[in-house]
Curated annotation (Swiss-Prot):
GO terms for molecular function: acyl carrier activity. Subunit of malonate decarboxylase, it is an acyl carrier protein to which acetyl and malonyl thioester residues are bound via a 2'-(5''-phosphoribosyl)-3'-dephospho-CoA prosthetic group and turn over during the catalytic mechanism. The keyword Transcription does not apply. This is Malonate decarboxylase acyl carrier protein. Keywords: Cytoplasm, Phosphoprotein. The modification O-(phosphoribosyl dephospho-coenzyme A)serine is found at residue 25. Belongs to the MdcC family. It is found in: Cytoplasm.
Length: 99
């Protein structure tokens, strides 16, 4: 198990909370909650040791250069592929946009 933390610039706090996905073989769950203005915080708890560079690259592609709401994201990973991670994050942001 490994715990990773990331931070990116953000706009105003998001409005809602959501939980998408579930932790099981090859998947992950993503919890998104309102955060502090100006900061998007991510904590990843993963079963895959030594994966920090992969997570950092994925988040840089997703979060740099766009105005995202200020949220706290908790990810519990059980070996999900980058495509599944992106899908779950997009689902989560879509959910909080409707709150």
């Amino acid at each position: 198990m490994e715990t990773l933390n990331f931070q990116f610039p953000a706009a105003e706090p998001g409005r809602g909370r959501t939980l998408v996905g579930c932790v099981s073989s090859g998947d992950l769950e993503v919890l998104i909650e309102p955060g502090t203005a100006g900061s998007l915080q991510i904590q990843v708890i993963t079963s895959v040791n030594g994966s920090a560079a992969r997570w950092a690259q994925l988040f840089q592609r997703l979060f740099e250069g766009r105005a995202w709401p200020a949220v706290n994201i908790d990810i519990h990973d059980f070996g999900a592929t980058p495509g599944v991670v992106r899908l779950r994050l997009e689902q989560g942001f879509e959910e909080i946009a409707h709150d």
